[in-house]
A protein has these predicted regions:
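Acidic/charged, solvent-exposed loop-and-adjacent secondary-structure segments enriched in E/D, K/R, S/T
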Residues: 114-135, 354
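Hydrophobic h-region of N-terminal signal peptides that target proteins for export
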Residues: 4-13
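Acidic, serine/threonine-rich low-complexity disordered tracts
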Residues: 14-122, 141-305, 456-460, 467-473
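Active-site neighborhood of thiol-dependent amide/isopeptide-bond enzymes
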Residues: 30, 339-424, 428, 440-443, ...
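Active-site rim recognition segments
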Residues: 201, 213, 217-231, 312-313, ...
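Generic recognition of flexible, low-complexity loop/linker segments
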Residues: 171-173, 185-186, 194-197, 280-281, ...
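Secondary-structure boundary elements
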Residues: 132-137, 300-302, 306-381, 452-457, ...
Length: 473
């Protein structure tokens, strides 16, 4: 769903505004050629400003379970096209999150509410900061010209994150729409490893959009946009994002030491290193990308008590922080954490006990339970649900924990799947996997990001683009 959320807020049809008026636009959304959803945008404008209401819908299911996602978003702009306020309601598999924000001076004050979470935060805006839902208005209002390029600071409302967006108007291109020739500008956008192309007309209407991950949208009539013959299944999404290696990995859960070649990689620093994962070689290619060779070992069995690790990262307060997804201060999470830590055990033993509890008490189902509290209440979920609940319980117990996103080998699919797992600091960082019940992750766990503000976007750099080969050391 992260990928879908990002794509849903890249662009909408956005007209130029004169006097007063309103209009409605529809886009049909496809993933690798298969219809999966639509976007409806209704824009109203007057001398007092602009109001845009949008609805994004993705029809998804996992076996017989409805996993559909709907996002309703209202953005208000002042007459000079600056953000005034916004409201956002996301419903993913029946789970709701609401975000409301209002500008005061150069600061956005926003409030995020979901089950077991209600918190206000503030973020500063600069002259270059625009909301992701309406940023095309800012581009089109100044006029479009081939060769024009620039940068914008983009606030992603669904994730409450700031990212830097680079854009360039590449060319003009004529498209056919309902038997008519439409002149468009082709705009390339890049942010955090993700690249999109948008075909937009002089009046700001988006006729086509595509990403380097296989998503596409096309302007359609309402009845066409809403016609979705069959729900996109999570298994089909998994299959399409699967990374097939050069050969199957035998006994992956008992794999302790492997060497990988991964390409294309955008920079020598794109893949992180840690105590398990070391980069051996980085080779620059003619296209400017890199081949990264790295050696990955399974997590060690024991804590190294003979050497005190010099690692100040465990002191970062974000590793004990409560978030909208990890409600570590909720009374139900706190009560379970106290129950699991009742025997006065060591932090490492407590982390292992929490790992086992989450593994045994959550059914392994491909349903997105969105938050730690959802996972605890429903007792089911996929890797992200397991990781969120584990992280909430360890943070509630005072154990610094970070969330890792990367790849892991699946014997069932004979390839690498995108996966989430936690790392805990218990004198040193240790990687665990509550989904698989591993106190020490195996060598097929390839870390691509760890929880920093932009880590979800950094993961987009790899999805649908990389190839992997492996060998023994």
């Amino acid at each position: 769903n992260l990928i879908f959320l990002i794509f849903a807020h890249i662009a909408h049809s956005q007209p130029l505004f004169e006097g007063e008026g309103e209009r409605e636009d529809w886009l049909g959304t496809y993933y690798k050629g298969k219809k999966m959803g639509f976007t409806k945008s209704k824009t109203r404008w007057s001398p007092e400003g602009i109001v845009m209401d949008s609805t994004v819908f993705f029809k998804i299911r996992s076996k017989s379970i409805d996993q559909s996602t709907i996002i309703k978003h209202t953005t208000r702009l002042s007459p000079d096209l600056k953000l005034s306020s916004f409201s956002l309601l996301q419903e993913i598999s029946g789970h709701r999150q609401q975000v409301e924000g209002k500008m005061e001076g150069n600061e956005l004050h926003y409030r995020t509410k979901s089950l077991g979470y209600d918190k206000e935060k503030t973020v500063k805006f600069t002259e270059q900061t625009v909301p992701s839902s309406t940023f095309l208005i800012n581009l089109v209002s100044d006029g479009l010209k081939v060769g024009q390029r620039g940068e914008l600071r983009l606030f992603m409302e669904p994730l409450q994150l700031m990212v830097d967006l680079e854009y360039k108007i590449l060319r003009q291109e004529t498209l056919q729409y309902e038997g008519k020739s439409i002149d468009t500008f082709v705009i390339r956008q890049r942010f955090s490893g993700m690249e999109t192309m948008i075909w937009v007309s002089h009046d700001g209407t988006v006729y086509r959009e595509s990403t380097n991950m296989g998503f596409e949208s096309f302007k359609e009539r309402p009845q066409v946009a809403q016609k979705i013959d069959e729900a996109m299944t999570l298994s089909s999404v998994i299959t399409m994002s699967l990374v097939k290696p050069n050969k199957p990995v035998p006994r992956p859960k008992n794999t302790y030491d492997l060497v990988y070649r991964i390409h294309p990689v955008s920079s020598p620093e794109a893949i992180p290193e840690d105590h398990r994962q070391k980069i051996i070689k980085v080779e620059k290619q003619e296209d400017g990308n890199y081949i990264t060779t790295l050696r990955i070992k399974s997590e060690s069995k024991k804590i190294d008590r003979t050497v005190q690790k010099k690692d100040e990262t465990e002191q970062d307060p974000k590793y004990l922080e409560e978030t909208a997804e990890v409600q570590s201060r909720h009374k139900m999470i706190q009560a379970l954490a106290r129950e699991l830590s009742a025997d006065g055990k060591s932090k490492w033993q407590l982390a292992k006990d929490i790992n086992l509890w989450v593994h045994l008490n959550l059914k392994k189902e491909m349903v997105d339970t969105v938050t730690a509290l959802d996972a605890l209440l429903e007792k089911r979920g996929e890797c992200q649900s397991h990781t969120y609940l584990f992280t909430a319980l360890t943070r509630a117990s005072g154990i610094p924990t970070r969330i890792i996103n990367g790849l892991v080998y699946s014997k069932e699919y004979e390839g690498f799947l995108y996966h989430a797992w936690p790392e805990v600091f218990v004198g040193e960082w240790k990687a665990m996997d509550p989904t698989f019940g591993q106190d020490r992750v195996d060598a097929t766990h390839i870390k691509l990001t760890e929880n920093s503000n932009e880590s979800p976007f950094h993961l987009m750099e790899f999805v649908g683009k990389i190839a992997i080969s492996w060998s023994e050391p």
